[in-house]
Amino acid sequence: MRVAIEELSKVEIITREAKVTELTENASRFGITGMTIYNALGCGVQLGTQEYEAEKNDSLRLLSKQVVMVVLPTREVDDFLDFVEKSLYTGHIGDGKIFVTPVTNAIRVRTGEEGMDALKEGTLD
């Protein structure tokens, strides 16, 4: 297995769709040149209960969310997480979850570049 020289981490952010725009508009501050965003259905420990509901749900109710996936150098993760937490925080149920996992390597298939080279802006030729 090929391993990247620089340690990389994957940050997966699950949140409301309305909060994703702020994340994407400001990601470049952290040198992020790419991300993956997809729609998801899910719920947390509240089982999909909304704050305006008087009683907690007894069964799972899946809510519409978006997942933002970013890979960046591990040394930059703490600053990025501070930004993400401040961007998402409302203090209400459903602000989201963040998962951080190590990434062994990243490979740009077209060029064979690996590690951070695979994540940086490349040439178009």
Say what each PLM segment does:
Residues 1-125:
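Positively charged, small/polar-rich N-terminal and surface patches that mediate targeting and assembly
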